[in-house]
């Protein structure tokens, strides 16, 4: 089973794959920057329910994640910065050098070769934390930096039928 799309699609697809026949293997092919550095790694899948974010979900890691950064050339600025914000968070919880590289990145004139390596590094940061704490009982909570408050804003925006992007 291949799941091709942004974070909403990979979340829904991962949840469906984990439920179908009590779980089938799936391969994530994320197409947005946020999906590449966040939703595609770690196996947290979920859907909104009753006006609340990610109320129904499971931990169901993909058997494989295929990252093709050529998809990123099609992103508008809004979607690019949604994912870039997540990468900055990874820089904050990683090394000063990683954060400096992210902060020095020219978002006005995107170097896609450099972005590809930065995506890889961001994914490695998340993978390292997820491997240490797969079910989010300890260090993995660092990945939620901003999410706790952010989810409250997202839920409010959903209730008012004015959804916002997850990465901001």
Give the label of every model feature segment.
Residues 12, 69, 145-148:
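Generic detector of well-ordered alpha-helical packing
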Residues 8-15, 36, 151-152:
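Short glycine/serine/threonine-rich phosphate/pyrophosphate-binding segments
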Residues 11, 49, 55, 128, ...:
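Short leucine-rich amphipathic alpha-helices used at interfaces
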Residues 14-107:
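A glycine/threonine-rich phosphate-anchoring loop and its flanking beta-alpha core
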Residues 105-168:
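Active-site segments that bind and position negatively charged phosphate/pyrophosphate groups
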Residues 8-9, 29, 41, 47, ...:
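Hydrophobic aliphatic residue packing
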Residues 1-3, 25:
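Glycine-rich phosphate-binding loops that contact phosphosugars or nucleotide phosphates
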Residues 4-6, 145-146:
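Glycine-rich beta-strand-to-loop/alpha-helix junction loops that act as flexible
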